[in-house]
Amino acid sequence: MDRHLVISSDCHAGLQPELYRDYLDPKHRDAFDAALPIQMAMIEESEKKFLVKEVNEQWREGRDQALSGAWDHGERVRVLDADGVAGEIIFPDGITEKNTPPFGAGLGLPTEGVDAELQWAGARAHNRWLAEL
């Protein structure tokens, strides 16, 4: 039997939004506290536009533990091992688990009407966390 090394090129990971605070530089934490409720409301609105609630809920049935691999290292390794995946390219997550990086630093990175310093702060916070994952 031939052996193959499997590298996934479409994995997603993100921390639960409120937990990003500890990964931000302290000077950005007040802005984070103010922005978090707005970000969560925007994600909930996006869910209404992009997800069919009933289909999403049906798909998620029985998958909660595996989906927690988006932020739980132990669960992620278990799922990857079960799938035979040896490595992965990881993208920041977003709508389905509400675990997008702060200040718009996730997928669909906005380019207008954003504070670039805060966006970079969100990206750095995500990368700090990702280095621990």
Predicted stretch roles:
Residues M1-L133:
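Helix-coil boundary/capping segments in enzymes
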